[in-house]
Structure formats: C-alpha cells, structure tokens
Amino acid sequence: MTTAFDIADIKRRMAGAVTSLKQELGGLRTGRASASLLEPITVDAYGANMPLAQVATVSVPEPRLLSVQVWDRGMVNAVEKAIRDSNLGLNPNTEGQTLRIRIPELNEERRKELVKVAHKYAEAARVAVRHVRRDGMDLLKKLEKDSAISSDDMERLSKDVQKATDETISEVDQTLAHKEKEILSV
C-alpha cells in the first residue's frame, strides 16, 4: 500500500543534484584544456544570444590547447569577442575560421580560489540532496499520519531514504575530491 511513496523518484532527484554539480565543476578552469570550459559561453549570433556549441565545434587537439572551429565565417569575430569577454582569462588567436586558445598555467592563488568555488558548488549539491531527503521524510510522515502506511513501513522507507541520502552525499564528496585533485595538480 506504499504506492504514494516512490523511493526511485527520491533517488532520481538526488542524482539530479550530482549531475548538476558535475556540470558546474566541468565549467571550472583547471590547468588542462576541456571543451566543457567553453560551454557556458553565449555568442551574439543572428540577432540572439546562442550557446557557443550552436555556432562552432570545440575540440582539444593538445592538453593545453582548445580549438574552436566556427561554422560561419561571419561569426568568427563574435565568437572571439564572446570568449574574450567570458571572464575565463582566455585569449584566442584567430586562424581563418578556427580560433586557437592556449590554456595558461594557473598560479597557486587562482588554484586556491577555484578549490573554494568547487567547495561552494559541492555544498550547494549537498543542500539540494538534503532538501530532497526532507521532502521524502515529510511525505512519509504525512502518509503515516493519514494511515496510508504502517509504522513498520515508515521505519523501513525512512531507512531507505537515509541510505540514498548517504550514498548521494558520498558521491558528491568523491566528485569534489576528484575535481580538487585535478585543480591542484600542477
């Protein structure tokens, strides 16, 4: 009789927080080139702001080099301007319809700043997971109060929710540790 409570939905919502964290961390600049570094950039194209991925192809030919192949020759200057204005500290060199972006080494101070930002993102993900947990527990309490589930079911499902929370927060911590190691490695 526990049809009103779906643990799979709770797990899916918690996994969404981890996915969001991974996307945010992917946008943090480390010392290595990564195509995801340019994902948040929007280009003023054809009278609208468009994601860079809709006007160009980004590739990583070398560990410290990004290559941006612009599809429309008329968009090269707009793409270059968008990359320069992105606050990522990147300086593209134009060669025809291709922009080459050398990724500079990060200094120690900038690395520490990036680690702090990564910790903020991870904490936001943990908070999101805890909110999902709270929502699940509130629903369980309501179902128990309305006699839709027994106290034994309440106990079992509460443990399932807590287990899912612990597993997800552990995944957040592992993701953060991996990114921190990546940022701090010279």
From Swiss-Prot:
Q: Which GO terms describe its cellular component?
A: cytosol
Reply yes or no: does the keyword Cytoplasm apply: yes
The molecular function terms of the Gene Ontology recorded here are:
ribosomal large subunit binding
Where, per UniProt, does this protein localize? Cytoplasm
One of this protein's Pfam families, by short name?
A: RRF
* Record keywords, A-Z: Cytoplasm, Protein biosynthesis
Among the GO biological process terms of this entry, one is: cytoplasmic translational termination
Domain of life of the native organism: Bacteria
**Coiled-coil portions:** none
- InterPro entries, per the entry: Ribosome_recyc_fac, Ribosome_recyc_fac_dom, RRF_sf
Function comment = Responsible for the release of ribosomes from messenger RNA at the termination of protein biosynthesis. May increase the efficiency of translation by recycling ribosomes from one round of translation to another.
Q: Which family does it belong to?
A: Belongs to the RRF family.
Q: Which HAMAP family match?
A: RRF
- This chain belongs to the protein called Ribosome-recycling factor
